[in-house]
Amino acid sequence: MSNSAAGPAELVFTRVFEAPRELVFECMTQPEHLTHFWGPAGTSAPVEHITVDPRPGGVFETVMINDADGSRYPTRAVYDEVAPPERLVWTEAHSGMTVTVTFTDLGGTRTGVEIRQVNVPEFVRSPEAQAGFRTSLDRFAGYLAALSAGRRTRSTS
């Protein structure tokens, strides 16, 4: 996994996941999956606080809750582009940050994911915020590994 500052208000994160592209895309567009990994370590995103309408103009809303003190962090975005299973683009209403997630089939059961954030607010560019974002990618990798293991078990039963 890597991340870089591509410009003064732009961040790029990349990660390779051991899961097929269709599954990785599905997990990013369905609340019952997002609830397992959305947000950094130490937060949760209850499924009842996640709304996903994956179509251009559709909403993407989440509420992350700090597990230690119960603080809530709502986010509302609108999808600009939805191209299954290749790309998701949304713009956050409050900050104006645009997020482009590109899913690349690397063959077999490997998927490359690039997350490009543009017009990134100052607080999101902090080292602490970037470290938190990386922990959410770690949580996503763990969730995908558990899903893939479950699917392999079911297919051999």
Task: Report residues per predicted region.
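Short, hydrophobic/aromatic-rich segments at coil-to-beta transitions
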Residues: 55-61, 83-90
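Intrinsic-disorder/low-complexity, polar/charged segments enriched in Ser/Thr/Lys/Arg/Asp/Glu/Gln
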Residues: 8-14, 21, 59, 74, ...
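Short amphipathic alpha-helical signal-transduction/dimerization elements
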Residues: 29, 137-148
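Short beta-edge strand/loop motif at the mouth of beta-sheet-based domains
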Residues: 12-13, 32-72, 152-157
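Beta-strand/loop substructures that line and gate deep hydrophobic ligand-binding cavities in soluble
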Residues: 87-135
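Hydrophobic ligand-binding cavity/cleft-lining segments
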Residues: 1-44
